[in-house]
Amino acid sequence: MASKTQKKNKIRQDIIEAASMYEQYLAGQAFLYVYGNEYFEVMFPVNRFLHLAGVETRLFAKKFYKNAREKTLTTQQFYFSPRHPFEVSKKKLSCLKRLYELTNTKVRILRNMETASVVYKVGISNLEFTLCLTENRDSNGEKINEYFLPMSLRAGRNSTKNGDDYGEVVL
């Protein structure tokens, strides 16, 4: 069985690998999703990477991403909590490394995805994981533009439950 230090080092390595993939395929880019007569655009800002990684840190989101991208992130710069437990982070990171797949393969579009705390207007899923999206709004709740932004990453087979709580599958 791996020690606590070994597990944390593995998570660090996964964060670094995920940051590399995010930088290569997603960071700063917008993607257009068209289904039926509808469409939406998703933007992948670097400050959203931290939340998708599922760990806690005292660093600002952009600094966390920069450290991960430059491979200078240390195991002392992130930690786990009841809100962001180790096992969930481990699952999220395996999906975060593959997040770009939602931009170049067939996906399911979900509308009005409801979780315990939030209703997401749109979600994108490959049936292994789901990216929950939110409108791009400022701190006053005013819409900034038409882009949707990554807000949450749901990992595992239950990422698109067949039920009303996960909204309407439209594609």
Model-derived segments and their meaning:
Residues 1-118:
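An acidic, glycine-rich, mixed-charge low-complexity segment common to nucleic-acid enzymes
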Residues 91-171:
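Conserved binding-pocket/active-site segment within a compact domain
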